[in-house]
From Swiss-Prot:
Enzymatic reactions: [HPr protein]-L-serine + ATP = [HPr protein]-O-phospho-L-serine + ADP + H(+); [HPr protein]-O-phospho-L-serine + phosphate + H(+) = [HPr protein]-L-serine + diphosphate
Binding site for Mg(2+): S160, E202
GO molecular function: ATP binding; magnesium ion binding; phosphorelay sensor kinase activity; protein serine/threonine kinase activity; protein serine/threonine/tyrosine kinase activity
Assembly mode: Homohexamer.
Cofactor(s) recorded in Swiss-Prot or TrEMBL: Mg(2+)
Amino acids binding ATP: G153, D154, S155, G156, I157, G158, K159, S160
NCBIfam families according to UniProt: hpr-ser (TIGR00679)
Key words of the record: ATP-binding, Carbohydrate metabolism, Kinase, Magnesium, Metal-binding, Multifunctional enzyme, Nucleotide-binding, Serine/threonine-protein kinase, Transferase
Protein name: HPr kinase/phosphorylase
Amino acid sequence: MTVTVKMLVDKLKLKVVYGNEELLAKAITTADISRPGLEMTGYFDYYSPERLQLVGMKEWSYLKTMTANNRYSVFANIFREETPAVVVARGLEIPEEMLQAAKENGVAVLQGRNSTSSLSGDMSWYLNSQLAERTSVHGVLVDIYGMGVLIQGDSGIGKSETALELVKRGHRLVADDRVDVYAKDEGTLWGEPAEILLHLLEIRGVGIIDVMSLYGASAVRDSSQVQLCICLEHFENDEVFDRLGNSNEEIELQGVKIPRIRIPVKTGRNVSVVIEAAAMNYRAKQMGYDATKTFKDRLTDLISKNGED
């Protein structure tokens, strides 16, 4: 996905101090952010001009100790053709020499009101999510009690209908039919809908419904972490399904492994309630309570008592 300076400005509500339409259309190609403190001393080895340049209180205070000519020289070296923009935090005053060098080198100058660390975190979070490599998977992503559950299965098995029932039970739809997943950082998988399918759900026999319009803003999310995969499968008499919770199946997406639970589907079974219970049970395991282990311990105690008798 291409991220432009204008998109960053709109997302983080930054003020454009200098920058025309052409400069704001510049692409940001990396999520890494540079604080050019060392470069201000004249050391440019390993300098990465393609990064966003962030000026905070430390850099600003150091600039105040320099002469006007030295400040201009510093920014003339920092600003390159490939530099997307410079962001000044805390609403600090923009030095005239910075503006002059920015105009001469074609670099947008932006200003944020937040602290330097807060602004850096916000920019990194946004850029990492937008620039991450994406994979599209077939399924439905639903936020169940704050946990992202990816529901997969054969076409026509009832994924969308199940998602609708979960929404009616107070949970939130993230994506239907196509889920774009990406690793925001190591070990963390996120999913979001394709823009054209945002907040929409397809129900066979009914058509396309707008979940946000029908059920309100509390029934949808624009993105969610993916923590659990539920695979719906047609019930077959000769098929063996886990009945004790011993299964440790996983699927791997974008290099991140998440647990997978296979749930048989047959007429009369309330799949949405089963998925809800599976999600709560998984969360309980994450918190240290394992119902399967409790059952095994009770069974072991019972066998021991019977043996003594």
